[in-house]
Amino acid sequence: MPGGGSQEYGVLCIQEYRKNSKVESSTRNNFMGLKDHLGHDLGHLYVESTDPQLSPAVPWSTVENPSMDTVNVGKDEKEASEENASSGDSEENTNSDHESEQLGSISVEPGLITKTHRQLCRSPCLEPHILKRNEILQDFKPEESQTTSKEAKKPPDVVREYQTKLEFALKLGYSEEQVQLVLNKLGTDALINDILGELVKLGNKSEADQTVSTINTITRETSSLESQRSESPMQEIVTDDGENLRPIVIDGSNVAMSHGNKEVFSCRGIKLAVDWFLERGHKDITVFVPAWRKEQSRPDALITDQEILRKLEKEKILVFTPSRRVQGRRVVCYDDRFIVKLAFESDGIIVSNDNYRDLANEKPEWKKFIDERLLMYSFVNDKFMPPDDPLGRHGPSLDNFLRKKPIVPEHKKQPCPYGKKCTYGHKCKYYHPERGSQPQRSVADELRAMSRNTAAKTANEGGLVKSNSVPCSTKADSTSDVKRGAPKRQSDPSIRTQVYQDLEEKLPTKNKLETRSVPSLVSIPATSTAKPQSTTSLSNGLPSGVHFPPQDQRPQGQYPSMMMATKNHGTPMPYEQYPKCDSPVDIGYYSMLNAYSNLSLSGPRSPERRFSLDTDYRISSVASDCSSEGSMSCGSSDSYVGYNDRSYVSSPDPQLEENLKCQHMHPHSRLNPQPFLQNFHDPLTRGQSYSHEEPKFHHKPPLPHLALHLPHSAVGARSSCPGDYPSPPSSAHSKAPHLGRSLVATRIDSISDSRLYDSSPSRQRKPYSRQEGLGSWERPGYGIDAYGYRQTYSLPDNSTQPCYEQFTFQSLPEQQEPAWRIPYCGMPQDPPRYQDNREKIYINLCNIFPPDLVRIVMKRNPHMTDAQQLAAAILVEKSQLGY
């Protein structure tokens, strides 16, 4: 019955293969062909298993056929050993045919049969179907190798396509991670255009979103990045704690009436608003409602859902403002004041559609608070909707508006779709986060802005400074930048006036109103920054610390400290040594024409304008001091110097003009007109010269080292015509030591026929030396003025500057009779051109003002030729006389 056993074995194997794997028809045929032969061989092999030494587990073929022919045992064992070797190839990984042959040869011996049989019984005897399965698997190996080779051919194509797409993206500047993100999202078969589109979208997303994403969650995150971006404010709202949210103060009446369409007091609207803020995480919410809203609803005051008010009151959210009835009349406290006051004190948000104009006008801080913290709203079908931009499109978002501190800086513009690859530059209207706070302007616009800033800075540091622009207590270092940036002094009036007009618009008009006059144009020396060195102390009432270096100690090109004069003040002092004063008088920079500015003619430039002052004008002038002691009074007038007609007097040497100073006018010069007739050095102040008020003086005792009368002849002469200017008679006081002289070289622009003015406020005296002969004219390196302090400037030599002529002032000894003199009491006649101008001005003013008034003012100011100043004086006179 071995044939039946083999058939059953074949059936079992086929059923097992049908369960475990697919068997092709060709494989099944091969298997059926091997079935009979293998079954016959196994039958012979199992016969020998009747040996009592063997395991009791034996197949059915051995039991049914106990007696078998043993002649072919060696042959059968050899075949079985070969089968065992084939099965051992799968189980024990032994593929050697030589070993199977050895087993066959050894199996002939009876002692070794048991060992071989044990090895064979370990697998084939107990599980015979495994042997055939292993053989069938070996038969499948060539087919599997074919399929694996086909599959191995496909990946190189996929890898090559992936590498191509990756290289293409890398050339465009994208990273490999971004390419992997896109390929995982779109798939490996995606077209290159689709990949590029996704890369562009992915490149515009913030780097923070990219770093958060990981490789494991690439597909999920890339598909939801846009939704996360749109929902990020809500996420931030959820993460906000109550500490970073502002308190909310709700105008209950306004919200309820708005929800009731201004007809019904709808308490449900208050509930909706409160719930909206509670959902956002706000904990500090207060609703103000007048107490009379708890009353029963009436036709004229409809109220709905009143139970909501009581519920919110129990939750300590709603507060009733006081209201009561007095003799049948309801007295209601102003609930809006409660709302604004609480919101202001708690730094919260007011929720209302009311503008609170009446309360905003009460306090400026309330107005500012209402403008910045008022949150308006709308109701859309029982939905409370505040605006996303409470303060307008350029203001903060609603989220940051309700926060104490903004969490994320908001981008006002939409991100640029091109990102870093945008080629629009500064013209791109989209937001570029990579540019940061860089100016969104072109290079040309930047250069224009820089040039405007430079021009404005140059104008502020220009060579002209308003006379009332610097306070009296200002130190020299405050204007060091101005001095440093000032150009060299120029005589061209157009350059000066252009800069000055810009400065004049920015300067206060306080002192203009005080002096009732027009400020004068003055120039700043550009190189007047040399600090005064310690030399001889002054003895003319200046502070003891004021010193001036002699010329030999000062390097060439360095100018002495600029002497400054305040408005309505006359004592010259260096800028660093100004005494401090409390008077609102400003320090200015005045040129040598301070006391002569009333001579500024609008038309001709007559060189005969040399006698600028008369006794009447002198007596009517005012000198006001900054303080009772140590103050500075200056004879600076506030009229313009007529630049347009080139009447400005400039010095050939820049050192001269800096050191020509106004002298202190003492009260005795006002009380006694004698010093003027004796050619005193006293400037005139015209601060209120148009007024009939008596001038106020701070009487000071005369300086002890100076005589009351220091007469000296003020003679301005040219070497060509010394006889044109007669000299006043000498005085007994002319022998006083150090009366002073100086050589002053001046010019009136390019006019060579220059004259000096009598009683010049900036005149310097040359001390007379008895060793000198009569008429000898020295030119020392420095001069001593009437008050005895040194003037550190040098006189230019004729050889170096031949176009300028020297003028000298000399105090002649009394025994010497001068060759020319001026009449003692008389004043020189005005030149014809001067009179012609006065006549023209008189005619023009008579066409505007009453002739009598014009005549009075022009008589009072005989040497004034400025029509504007005369008109101002006429207006003052007219107001005083009551015309």
Curated annotation (Swiss-Prot):
C3H1-type ZnF: 410-435
Cofactor(s) recorded in Swiss-Prot or TrEMBL: Mg(2+)
Keywords: Endonuclease, Hydrolase, Magnesium, Metal-binding, Nuclease, Phosphoprotein, Zinc, Zinc-finger
Annotated segments matching region Disordered: 53-109, 139-158, 456-551, 680-738, 754-775
Gene Ontology annotations for the cellular component aspect, listed alphabetically: cytoplasmic ribonucleoprotein granule; nucleus
Gene3D superfamilies: 3.40.50.11980
Comp. bias (Low complexity): 705-714
Induction behaviour: By cytokines (TNF-alpha and interleukin-1) in acute monocytic leukemia cell line THP-1 cells.
Bias (Basic and acidic residues) ranges: 503-515
UniProt feature, compositional bias: Polar residues: 466-477, 517-542
Coiled coil: none
Domain RNase NYN residue range list: 245-400
Any GO molecular function: mRNA binding
E.C. designation(s): 3.1.-.-
Residues the record lists as Phosphoserine modifications: S230
Pfam short name (any one): Regnase_1_C
Keyword Zinc: yes
PROSITE patterns noted in UniProt: ZF_C3H1
Job of this protein: May function as RNase and regulate the levels of target RNA species.
UniProt family annotation: Belongs to the ZC3H12 family.
Annotated protein name in UniProt: Probable ribonuclease ZC3H12C
